[in-house]
Amino acid sequence: MSKEDMIEFSGTVMELLPNAMFRVKLDNEHSILAHTSGKMRKNRIRVLAGDRVNVEMTPYDLTKGRITFRFK
């Protein structure tokens, strides 16, 4: 799947879950499970509850996503 096929949303991290997973509430009031992208892990960018994030999701599974950016 190419990067152009991904859907981007903004949301807020609601809770931290085990195995580096996060519960994210999107701006459209949906709640999804998300993990951080590889570049965020490599650069040790911390994500905490209450942070605003960008999430990209595949159109095939709209319940899971990848956190690609944390707003300051």
UniProtKB/Swiss-Prot annotation:
Question: What does the UniProt keyword field contain?
Answer: Cytoplasm, Initiation factor, Protein biosynthesis, RNA-binding, rRNA-binding
Pfam families reported for this sequence: eIF-1a
Source domain of life is Bacteria
Does Protein biosynthesis count among this protein's keywords? Answer: yes
Subunit organization: Component of the 30S ribosomal translation pre-initiation complex which assembles on the 30S ribosome in the order IF-2 and IF-3, IF-1 and N-formylmethionyl-tRNA(fMet); mRNA recruitment can occur at any time during PIC assembly.
NCBIfam families assigned:
infA
Give the protein's function. One of the essential components for the initiation of protein synthesis. Stabilizes the binding of IF-2 and IF-3 on the 30S subunit to which N-formylmethionyl-tRNA(fMet) subsequently binds. Helps modulate mRNA selection, yielding the 30S pre-initiation complex (PIC). Upon addition of the 50S ribosomal subunit IF-1, IF-2 and IF-3 are released leaving the mature 70S translation initiation complex.
Q: Chief localization class?
A: cytoplasm
InterPro entries reported for this sequence: NA-bd_OB-fold (IPR012340), RNA-binding_domain_S1_IF1 (IPR006196), TIF_IF1 (IPR004368)
Q: List each copy of the S1-like domain by range.
A: 1-72
* Molecular function terms, GO-annotated: ribosome binding; rRNA binding; translation initiation factor activity
Q: What is this protein's name? A: Translation initiation factor IF-1
